[in-house]
Structures are given as C-alpha cells and as structure tokens.
Amino acid sequence: MTRTFLFLIIASLLTRLTPAEAQNIRPAPRPPAQTGTPPNESAAPDGYAPIPEWAGQTRAPRAAKTAGYSVETVAEGFTGAFSFSFLPDGRILVGERPGHIKLVGKDGKVSEIEGLPTTLWARGQGLFEVRPDRAFATNRTIYLTYTVLPDGANASALPRLPAVVVVARAKLSSDDKRIEDLKVLLNAEGTGGRLAQAPDGTLLITSSIPAGLGINSVDWPQPQALDSNMGKVLRINPDGTIPKDNPFVGRAGAHPEIYALGFRDIQGITINPRTGKLWTSEHGPRGGDEINAVEKGKNYGFPVIGYGREYTGKPINGDKTRQDGMEQPVYFWTPDIAPSGIGFYTGKLFPAWQGDLFVAELVGRSLVRLTLNGERVVGEERLLTELNSRIRGVNEGPDGALYVLTDGNGGKILRLAPKP
C-alpha cells in the first residue's frame, strides 16, 4: 500500500548502476526450469533475476486455461476500497480506506454503515479490514482494522510517518445501519492491518513497515525486532487477550502478540480451508514480491534475506537470499507485480480451480491463479487482463462463484461464474 507514495521518491533516487555494481547483482545461472509452457513474466529490464531455491519458486510455467468464465458487475462506485467479505446470507461488507463501511445487498444496492470512530486517520492509510466473526449469524460481531495517529502527533506535520494500527470489535445493529459497542482489542505500531480468523477463532493481523521510515533496508530493522510489531503477523483472542500458546509469550522484551516475523509489507492474508494454515502475499521493495505459507514462530527473513533490491537498484544485504533459521517464500516475483488480496478456491462452480490460490494483482492489472502441488507452485495463469483494472481483493462467495474487488475511485465488485 506504500507503492503509490514511494513512486515519487523512487523516481528521484533511481540512478544508473556502474559496471561494478551491475556485476555485483548479476546472479549465477538459475536451476533448470520446470517443464511446461513459458512463464507469464518477462525478465526485469536490467536482467536482474535472483537465483531461486528450487525450480518453480518463481516464473512457474504458464498454467493451462482450464475454465471459461463470464464476468458481471455486482456493485460499483467504491472509493479507495481495500477489503470485502461476505456475510452468511450472501451480502457483502466493503471497507473503504477514507473511512467508510459499505453494505452491498443481494440486489446490488449499496448503503453506508455509520459509526466508525472519529479518531480514524485516513492519511495513515485509513480503514483496512471489515470482517464478520465466524459466528456472525448468532453474535453479529464484526472486526475492524484501521489507523489512528500516535499519541501527541500532529497530522499535518507527520502525514506519512508511523501510524498506529487499531484492531477493534463491534456489533452490527439489527437494522444493519451502524456499528455499535466498539471495543479496541489491540494497538500496534505500523501500517497494514489485514485480518483473518483462524479455525480456532483467534485473530491473525498484519502490521507492516510505513513509508515514512525510509526507503533503504537499513532503515527497516523492526521486522527482526521482537520489541516491535512492525513487519509481523500478530495473533490475539477475539476478546483481545493473548493466546497462551503464542510463540514469544514469556520472552523478556518480546511483544507477546507476535506470531511470526520478518515481513516487509503484507498485502493479503488468508486461511487455507483445507489445511487451516495461514498464507500471505507481500510487497517487496523493487522486486521480490512474495507468497508465504506462515507458521507460528518462524522468521521470514526481511530485511536480512529477500529476492528484491533497494529502490536505487543496489542489492539488499549483499544480495543475500538464504540464511539458516529463515524461511523461504513459497513463490516470488521479480520484477514485481504488487500482489494484494489472496484467497483459495474450494467451490463447485469451477472444479478445475479447486485448491488453487488466487492473487489480486495491482501492477499487472490481473487476477493471478497459482496451481499448487502441496506448497509448491506448478503453474501460473493471468485472468481478467482484458479489464485493464488494478485488482485489490479476491474471495470465494457462498454461491461458489469467484468475486474480485477493483481498486481506486469507481471501484467495482465483479463476479466470475462459468460461461453458460
């Protein structure tokens, strides 16, 4: 989500590499490619192509087009929509970053839900998630994540410096017009705020590195620091208490809510419904966008290892891509695609897609389908390229169709169903 802001900075900082610098980042030959059709991605303009740990960790073969689909508009006119989720009856909650919750009826009509706190700070990125509890049908509970100003900070003086991500719980009123009984569960320094609810009911929340901390990896020590929430996946109970089995509970100086560490800018989060495991999508700096299968207590490397570069084009930490005790991504893209929301498909309308991971793509303006063998990617397909729209989110609907959210002003929710 920091990409738009960073564009102007990057443009002013990029310089031509000297021959020596170019030699320093030129990788050795990669492992043999997987068999199959050519990958979707072209190489980076300067030829940079970091060496993967295994064939298929990047630039997987182009997946076969196994399903035709039709696209219909469910609702439109959203401004800065960042997330959407389904209520049990099929209606849709939409979170807009400027600070609005929208409710999409089954007829496609859009209404606004009032009651967001006035402390929400849109310039710090605003409203991120609006997600119903797994037991919403009986408790009408929803969870929110949004940014507020740090205590004592001046919004005009600190337009993009570190915000505070708030995780809150509230009730949706019986008439669906407002949220009530809002309770703050957690305040975490950083930005981001994607949220998923695990099968055991616990809440998994992301907190990323704000743009205001700088553009070089040396400016980002927080993802490796257990006394900071930045660059982490956090885990709390639905009442805001800390699960006793969190990995760093009781460790001196560590935040007990930390579940996993070593991330830069998580943009998507989902639970694999078949395994119950958490998966994330992440923006690298210049290249090195990642998909990770996240486990409790594990370290995902940033900024010590990674498959991207500084915005100046120089290597990060000597171009290091592996280190003992740090996890490898399931998949990465270089050059970057700016992945956003992600979701697994398990429905019956598209049998050929069952078990596939779908990734909303901002830069390439497509919906990415990753075919998997366990936790290894074996194919990649780009969908919806004909729309030429930035895709912000993707979810399977209760009807088994696939729904996507487009980005920006005039955003839409689209429904993908099999062609008649």
Name each model-derived stretch.
Residues 263, 377-398:
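Conserved blade-ending motifs and adjacent loop-strand segments that build the rim/top face
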